[in-house]
Amino acid sequence: SAAYVGMAVFITGGKGAGQYGYVNTYNAGTKVATIKKYSDNSDGWEQIVSGRAIEAALDNTTVYSVEPRVVVQAPGNDGSTATSTALCRAKVADGKISEVRIIHPGSSYTTAPTVTFTDPNNTADAPLETFIGDGVLAQPAFTSRGTGWTTLSATIEDVGQEKDITGVTFTANPYAEILLTAN
């Protein structure tokens, strides 16, 4: 199933807070998803907070959010080279992207980058314009908010050697397996 493939997963509270990645594969029958890093598409989580260790085993304090993934790509074929690409989160309200929160603005942009949203469930895209200022990405301006965007959240229950986050399972493997269920 492609229900959540490409969507962002942010751990927003408790153990592992600040970790993020995106859904690479999702099995609707088992509700198992694999997580990849934004930076290099390898298996596992990244951490928003510089220097904070990645938590391999989460517990019943962990809270996460699945939301449209925002990808900011450096412009191509124009001589510009972003030395660091931006990291953003899409805020969804009433099924529409209401804002894009810039967590890290990136650096060394000489022209505005391309921004894409990934949510296999959306029914209308959310086109926007990007701007740069002093070589960093500025807040975008929407021309339409789109419709049908999805978010969900989960709670965690402790289950022996594994941690079950209302269907989210983390194992000793170097990547996370997440079981997703919509609210």
Regions found by a protein language model. Name each.
Residues N27-D43, S98-R101, I178-L180:
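Short, solvent-exposed secondary-structure boundary/capping segments
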Residues T34-T61:
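Short solvent-exposed strand/turn elements
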